[in-house]
Amino acid sequence: MRREPPAINRLWGWATLIVIGMVCLTETGCSKKTPKYPEDHARFQRVVQAIKTLETAYVNKDAPAFHELLLPLEQLEILESEAQQDFATFSTIHLDFTVDRIVIDGNRISAFMSWQGTWQRSIQESSDSARGHGVLLWSGNQVILLRGVEGDLPFGMASRLNRSS
């Protein structure tokens, strides 16, 4: 003689299946989250891209690309000449920027950075390593350009390493 399971067991089984199904649908259906403020998010992405472009231009010793990111200010002309001196002095530059924080206040953008890198004069010589922290000051909305620097940034290592030798 065969007995049917009590109704409570069948109800429990169906309830479990429904809950598992709802969890699966929720997990797969809500996986794509759009930014709350899309214009600010797009601007943030442009700042990050400008930082990556600056890093790449410096590592590849690409003076025109480096120049394109700078506002025409006297402080940045000095920065650019220091970078060009690095390009002429070192055969190989490896640099890693890490963005610690980005603060956007109207048209003023501050990117707080940590960095580490190695600079090698020639293949026969050993490389010099350095690390530090600084702030890249950017400006703009659609086009992001460097307007200043603060702190210890890697540009101008040729003169710094000559002084410490």
Question: What is each residue range found by the language model?
Answer:
Residues 2-16:
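Bacterial N-terminal signal peptides that target proteins for export
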Residues 16-24:
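Hydrophobic helical h-region of N-terminal Sec-dependent signal peptides
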Residues 26-29:
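C-terminal motif of bacterial Sec signal peptides marking the signal peptidase cleavage site
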Residues 31-33:
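Bacterial signal peptide processing site
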Residues 38:
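Glycine-rich phosphate-binding "P-loop"
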Residues 42, 48-49, 64-112, 118-119, ...:
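Short solvent-exposed beta->alpha transition segments
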Residues 54-66:
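Short helix-adjacent coil turns
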Residues 106-165:
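Exposed beta-sheet edge and beta->alpha loop/turn motif
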